[in-house]
A protein has these predicted regions:
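Beta/alpha (TIM)-barrel catalytic core signal, keyed to glycine-rich beta->alpha loops juxtaposed to Asp/Glu
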Residues: 131-342, 347, 351
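N-terminal binding-site loop/beta-alpha segment at the start of enzyme catalytic domains
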Residues: 1-86, 105, 112, 121
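Surface-exposed, active-site-proximal loop segments in enzymatic domains
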Residues: 58-63, 89-104, 134-143
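Residues at the N-termini of beta-strands
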Residues: 15, 46, 122-125, 172, ...
Length: 352
């Protein structure tokens, strides 16, 4: 599988990254190890995780995904694996350092704990899972100045990362769920103060949420920050498994097996919106008309985007994982690509 260099780093990663958010909740340790083995047999060398996983996050399972990866990783040649993890941002999970800010002490503690769970001496790419500051993320469409709060500065966060790079505990730094302002500020602060420069941004990108194209595409191109695209299947909506009815009258299927039925409806409301389901149904119809599955259409389309360095895929079975990887070999016709743009123009970013 072709490798891509991330940002200005020397990390060379596969065009597909294995996401692991199901390990420890929807997948057992043995199943997680099987997925890792299969992914690497197909040429994937890139794993993404975070201290917070698995999802849905809860105190009882906190860190389980990293522990599962760790028992696999200790049996592998370490230089064969490009490992990415993240530090949780503030205010969402009170069981993670009391939900506190991204202070230097918090970042250092998070790295030390992740290294123990992962059974490794270093993490190749360490990412800030979401901003410490007030920012429009996770389905919030507009910035709200009334939600401003005190938080650790970007300079303080990068200083802590710099200490960890010098100590050999992390190699490169990235951000996640960021905005054009955030990317620009991280790059400017790093260059102004001689601190680690972010190599990557990990943001959602899929057929029902193309918000990356609203300024982040140019920002990342000009700052040489690589996109790691997560949720390419729109939390599973783009597979069609959550839909019943026809393309004109799609209905959510509560009996489907997956994340959107396993967890409470408020877990991912943007993927449950009527307009999201309407768009997903249209993409299903398009995929069927061209002899492919909804998953293959959604992933092949992501794999074809010029600004995506690596697409993060996740699965709960080896069959799903195989289909997701196989989609890399599907080239979408000009007719299909034009149809995608027509649907997008009619139902614009419903899951943003």
């Amino acid at each position: 599988m072709k490798k891509i260099r991330l940002g200005r780093s020397d990390l060379e990663v596969s065009r597909i990254c294995l996401g692991t958010m199901t390990f420890g909740e929807q997948n057992t340790e043995a199943e997680g190890h099987s997925q890792l083995d299969y992914a690497f047999s197909r040429g994937i060398n890139f794993i993404d995780t975070t201290e917070m996983y698995p999802v849905k996050p809860r105190a009882e399972t906190y860190g389980s995904t990293e522990r599962i990866i760790g028992t696999w990783l200790k049996k592998q040649p370490r230089d064969r694996v490009v490992l990415a993890s993240k530090v949780a941002g503030p205010a969402r999970n009170p069981w993670i350092r009391n939900g506190g800010d991204l202070t230097p002490d918090s970042i250092r503690a998070a790295v030390e704990d992740s290294l123990k769970r992962l059974q490794t001496d270093y993490i190749d790419l360490y990412q800030i899972h979401w901003p410490a500051r007030n920012a429009p993320i996770f389905g919030q469409k507009r910035f709200n100045p009334e939600a401003e709060r005190q938080c650790a500065t970007i300079e303080a966060q990068l200083e802590a990362m710099g200490d960890l790079v010098r100590a050999g505990k992390i190699r490169y730094v990235g951000v996640s769920n960021e905005t054009p302002w955030g990317v620009t500020e991280f790059v400017n602060v790093a260059e102004r103060h001689g601190l680690p420069r972010i190599a990557t941004i990990q943001n959602p990108y899929n057929l029902v949420n193309r918000s990356f194209e609203q300024g982040l595409d140019e920002t990342c191109f000009r700052t040489e920050v690589s996109l790691l695209a997560y949720s390419p299947l729109g939390f599973g909506q783009l597979t069609g498994k959550y839909l019943t009815g026809d393309a004109n009258h799609p209905v959510f299927n509560p009996d489907a097996v997956g994340r959107l039925t396993r967890f409470s409806p408020d877990w991912s409301p943007r993927y449950m919106r009527a307009e999201t389901m309407a768009a997903a149904a249209r993409y299903q119809e398009l995929a069927r008309a061209h002899g492919m599955s909804g998953a293959t259409l959604a992933l092949s389309w992501c794999y074809s985007r010029w600004f995506i360095a690596s697409t993060i895929i996740g699965a709960t079975s080896l069959a799903q994982l195989k289909e997701n990887v196989d989609a890399l070999d599907t080239a979408l016709s000009a007719e299909v690509l034009s149809a995608v743009e027509r649907i997008h123009a009619e139902i614009h970013n419903p899951a943003q």
